[in-house]
């Protein structure tokens, strides 16, 4: 008899294991392990001129840009066309260590998120871009102009990266990428990159606004002299936002770097990369950062998902001034549109319609929508509410809670970020949980079938609803497996598993009055609905 029960237990265990495996879905769940992931570091995707390479290192000169590739090993994964997510790091557009401990494609946060995407079956790419600007200049034109130029060149690099990725997928596709689905994710400064990448599409957008013009005659950001009213960006020198035009005159090859030498007495300083390959993307995501100007956004831009700290001192949540920290001082740069403003524009314009976020009733979606700072209950923005520990010192707020770094770094833990890996990983959990359902919707628009969790061919009835004492949840045509209930802030108030019945009674008498989100898992899928306690 004992052996019989042991055998039955083993069979049940195997069935449960089989159910858990079959319930996992590629692109939604982590279907690969860390051991299954291959990393290809330091792959060059493009080259271009940088005027901020120090003379001690041979600058100004042409430099390479790198990306690290994270993907399920092709000996394990049989999928031949895998969607791509390209990540861009933070660092205030300055070399690592000048403004923060972050500043390249190997930053902890972008590496962690790249690995998480790869374990879900994506090809994830962490990319560098050109850095450098006169962040602490006392000349407003030089400070503001070089900052705009830094964003501009980073967009050119990002487009070169997308073209390199798509071009590789179209030619030999050794990394088995889908050229028809590429998403971008920017962290901190990388958020400025993804915003500008998605919205900047004509010269007038950087030439016409007064804030992007010289306020006085004097030295220009590319050398020489300029007049008041001239635009900071000169496409004859640096090319357009796609990285075309303004071509440099090549005079030879550096014996040190092996890269082209250019004639700095000539006007052009741009080197086009992967010309002719399309650079359009399917989705952009920002964790912090801002939109350089709200007028950049227009109908037809790619859908956008945003994450932002409400009290971010360095990049505004609504609208406001960009502030950059250098050596304990803060330098104001330019007024921009924050993530909340950008999300509202993208929602109203219809760009985010494809994400269908208003139908999502999971705890993270409900919490994001109902956040008290989210004026208008905008979709597709997740707000973090951390306050600075001292309201008189707003610059101490933790505006990048997903970042952590080497504890031995000279710029180590502070009140602004305690540099606790476990805490940062928890914030990344939230970022992934909010991103994945929306990423799935964008993928479905490109021909995938992701996240089809809710199946409409069975009915769930909750009665009475509103409820004051108890309610009965009944299913028609299916068996209820579990029920979970959370409030509008995403806090769990009720969980019951292993039900295996077509109905279940829930006592609501002790609950506070309000609206609750009920998630019912059945043997034919999941339904999410509302329950009101009156």
Task: Name each model-derived stretch.
Residues 23, 513-534:
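C-terminal tail/sorting-segment detector
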Residues 25-80:
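N-terminal cap/lid segment of alpha/beta-hydrolase-fold proteins
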Residues 80, 143-156, 160-188, 200-209, ...:
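Gly/Ser-rich "nucleophile elbow"/oxyanion-hole loop immediately N-terminal to the catalytic nucleophile
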Residues 80-91:
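Short beta-strand element of the alpha/beta-hydrolase
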Residues 92-109, 122-152:
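Cap/lid segment of the alpha/beta-hydrolase catalytic domain
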Residues 104, 108, 302-388:
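Active-site-adjacent alpha-helix of alpha/beta-hydrolase-fold enzymes
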Residues 294, 347-449:
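C-terminal catalytic histidine-bearing segment of alpha/beta-hydrolase fold enzymes
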Residues 441-463, 469, 476-478, 491-492:
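Residue-level detector of functionally pivotal "anchor" positions at catalytic/ligand-binding pockets or at interdomain
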């Amino acid at each position: 008899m004992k052996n019989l029960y042991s055998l039955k237990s083993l069979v049940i265990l195997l069935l449960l294991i089989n159910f858990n495996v079959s319930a996992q879905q590629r692109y939604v769940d982590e279907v690969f392990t860390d051991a299954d992931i291959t990393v290809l570091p330091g792959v060059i995707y493009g080259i271009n001129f940088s005027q901020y390479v120090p003379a001690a290192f041979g600058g100004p000169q042409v430099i390479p840009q790198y990306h690290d590739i994270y993907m399920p090993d092709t000996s394990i994964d049989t999928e031949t066309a895998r969607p791509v997510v390209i990540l861009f790091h933070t660092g205030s557009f300055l070399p690592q260590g000048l403004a923060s401990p972050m500043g390249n494609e190997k930053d902890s946060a972008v590496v962690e998120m790249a690995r998480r995407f790869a374990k879900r079956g994506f090809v994830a790419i962490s990319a560098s871009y050109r850095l450098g600007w006169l962040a602490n200049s006392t000349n407003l034109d030089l400070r503001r102009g070089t900052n705009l130029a830094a964003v501009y060149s980073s967009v050119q690099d990002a487009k070169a990266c997308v073209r390199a990725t798509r071009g590789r997928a179209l030619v030999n596709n050794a990394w088995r990428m889908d050229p028809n689905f590429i998403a971008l994710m920017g962290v901190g400064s990388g958020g400025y990159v993804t915003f500008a990448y998605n919205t900047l599409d004509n010269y007038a957008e950087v030439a016409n606004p007064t804030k992007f013009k010289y306020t006085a005659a004097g030295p220009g950001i590319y050398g020489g002299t300029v007049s008041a009213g001239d635009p900071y960006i000169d496409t004859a020198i640096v090319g357009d936002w796609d990285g075309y035009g303004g071509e440099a005159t090549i005079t030879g090859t550096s014996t040190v770097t092996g890269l082209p030498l250019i004639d700095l007495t000539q006007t052009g300083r741009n080197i086009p990369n992967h010309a002719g390959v399309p650079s359009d993307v399917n989705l952009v995501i920002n964790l912090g950062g801002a939109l350089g100007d709200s007028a950049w956004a227009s109908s037809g831009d790619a859908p956008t998902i945003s994450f932002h700290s409400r009290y971010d001192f360095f990049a505004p949540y609504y609208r406001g001034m960009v502030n950059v920290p250098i050596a304990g001082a803060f330098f104001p740069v330019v007024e921009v549109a924050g993530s909340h403003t950008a999300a509202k524009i993208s929602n109203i314009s219809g760009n985010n319609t494809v994400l269908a976020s208003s139908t999502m009733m999971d705890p993270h979606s409900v919490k994001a929508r109902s956040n008290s700072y989210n004026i208008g209950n905008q979709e597709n923005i997740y707000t973090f509410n951390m306050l600075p520990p001292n309201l008189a010192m707003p610059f101490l707020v933790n505006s990048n809670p997903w970042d952590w770094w080497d504890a031995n770094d000279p710029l180590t833990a502070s009140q602004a970020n305690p540099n606790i890996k476990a805490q940062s990983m928890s914030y990344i959990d939230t970022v992934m949980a909010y991103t994945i359902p929306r990423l799935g919707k964008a993928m479905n628009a490109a021909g995938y079938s992701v996240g089809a969790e809710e199946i409409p061919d069975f009915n769930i009835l909750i009665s009475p609803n509103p409820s004051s004492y108890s309610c009965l949840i009944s299913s028609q045509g299916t068996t209820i497996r579990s029920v979970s209930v959370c409030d509008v802030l995403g806090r769990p108030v009720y969980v019951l598993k292993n039900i295996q019945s077509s109905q279940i009674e829930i006592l609501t008498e002790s609950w506070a009055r309000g609206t609750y989100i009920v998630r019912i898992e059945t043997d034919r899928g999941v339904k999410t609905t509302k329950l009101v306690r009156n």
